[in-house]
Amino acid sequence: MTNIRIGQGYDVHQLTEGRKLILGGVEIPFEKGLLGHSDADALLHAVTDALLGAAGLGDIGSHFPDTAAEFKDADSRVLLRAAYQSVQAQGWQVVNVDTTVIAQKPKLAPHIPQMRANIAADLGIDISCVNIKGKTNEKLGYLGRMEGIEAQAAVLLVRI
């Protein structure tokens, strides 16, 4: 049996008026927020998918369906911690997390240190093991038109 595994996660949510913008568990001041059943934290959803995928446990939708009332407006940090408990129960531990958030606006750099701290705390790893890169889409496509925000994540697990 393999002692290391890598998982890849992806999420995208539409930007809309009347919602808070939450990424990496951080509320970011912006005129729009992400539309979703939960708090729509695309970054944490991508990390959660990467964790579950690496452990062979499906995806975020199979664990926390958007049709379930108990996950309406759910805090994605709570979902991430619950998913990681399932991963640990299978005998896996996170080595590192590398992510990319693609958003034309707002600028993410001022918020990245707190996002990293949140993810590190939720996974019980050192902040140096969490990386977040903020990118724009150079005004191309739906991301460039500020219709949504996309997140990608890679997670390395080791057998414990």
UniProtKB/Swiss-Prot annotation:
Q: Which SUPFAM superfamilies match?
A: IpsF-like
Q: Which cofactor does it need?
A: a divalent metal cation
Keywords on record: Isoprene biosynthesis, Lyase, Metal-binding
Q: Which GO terms describe its biological process?
A: isopentenyl diphosphate biosynthetic process, methylerythritol 4-phosphate pathway; terpenoid biosynthetic process
What is the cofactor note? Binds 1 divalent metal cation per subunit.
Catalysis performed (reactions): 4-CDP-2-C-methyl-D-erythritol 2-phosphate = 2-C-methyl-D-erythritol 2,4-cyclic diphosphate + CMP
Annotated a divalent metal cation binding sites: D11, H13, H45
Pathway the protein acts in: Isoprenoid biosynthesis; isopentenyl diphosphate biosynthesis via DXP pathway; isopentenyl diphosphate from 1-deoxy-D-xylulose 5-phosphate: step 4/6
Q: Which InterPro entries match?
A: MECDP_synthase, MECDP_synthase_CS, MECDP_synthase_sf
Q: Which domain of life is it from?
A: Bacteria
> EC number(s) for this protein?
4.6.1.12
Question: Subunit details for this protein?
Answer: Homotrimer.
Which HAMAP family does the record associate with it?
A: IspF
Q: What does this protein do?
A: Involved in the biosynthesis of isopentenyl diphosphate (IPP) and dimethylallyl diphosphate (DMAPP), two major building blocks of isoprenoid compounds. Catalyzes the conversion of 4-diphosphocytidyl-2-C-methyl-D-erythritol 2-phosphate (CDP-ME2P) to 2-C-methyl-D-erythritol 2,4-cyclodiphosphate (ME-CPP) with a corresponding release of cytidine 5-monophosphate (CMP).
Entry protein name: 2-C-methyl-D-erythritol 2,4-cyclodiphosphate synthase
Which organism does this sequence originate in? Neisseria gonorrhoeae (strain ATCC 700825 / FA 1090)
